[in-house]
Amino acid sequence: MNQITGGIRQGKSALPDSITGGADMDWYPLWNSLRIAALSCIIVFFVGIFAAYYVAKLPRLLKGILDVLFTLPMVLPPTVCGYFLLILLGSKRPLGIFLARFGIQFAMTWYGGIAASSVVAFPLMYRTVRGAFESFDSSLAYSGQTLGLSNTYIFWRIRMPVCRQGILAGLVLAFARALGEYGATSMLIGYVPGRTATISTTVYQLWRTNNEVEAFRWVMINIAISAVILLIVNMLERKNKKAGGV
């Protein structure tokens, strides 16, 4: 594996050294993947919730149009999403040139991965939360209105707690999608050791250079993380069924 300057190293790991490579393994791709996924989830959490809330209240025709638009990144190949992001945010594009004046550059930077991961993870958050909101008992909101409660209070103190299991499930799925993102990320930020390397791009680069042992280690780490995420999703689903909620 290429030496990654400035990477975060750990002397010990919960996994065996045969998998992790011990203290000599560079952990930057893991750290970078986790921070990109976490920051992406913060974005899709707020955008997904408010998009789902307002779309659910729209007329059927407009709702259908926006639903297709918001869900499109989920069915498009990730490389196509990355291509559109390059067209939009590339350093030679109008928006990219404008952002560069403020020192903001998405192409070939780690935070460009946030943009790519947010785009591909958003549909999962949006659709899951929209389903939770559509299953919400509207009589609860009407009761709150008759008591003089504001729409803001009803949203945050009634609707959100009732739909929390669906929201959490959507957030976990979005995190998993962002963590495993490869196509759009590789198109926008590429693979620069110590700067833009993620788990997915690192696995590909290691495989391409015939370093199968290191690639296998990263694959096993990714599988372990994904298994934990799936366990969390299943746990949330069981809690949701027991509560008889959304």
Report each predicted region and the residues it spans.
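Periplasmic/extracellular loop-to-transmembrane helix junction in inner-membrane transport proteins
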Residues: 11-42, 57-59, 206-213
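Interhelical loop and adjacent transmembrane-helix boundary motif
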Residues: 19, 24-28, 187-227
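C-terminal transmembrane helix and the adjacent membrane-cytosol boundary/short C-terminal tail
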Residues: 62, 123, 130-141, 145-146, ...
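Transmembrane alpha-helical segments of polytopic membrane transport and secretion proteins
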Residues: 1-24, 60-63, 233-246
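Transmembrane-helix boundary motif in ABC transporter permease subunits
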Residues: 39-70, 83-85, 132-134, 140-141, ...
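Non-cytoplasmic
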Residues: 90-91, 167-205
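Membrane-interfacial helix termini and adjacent extracytoplasmic/periplasmic loops
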Residues: 21, 82-118, 189-192
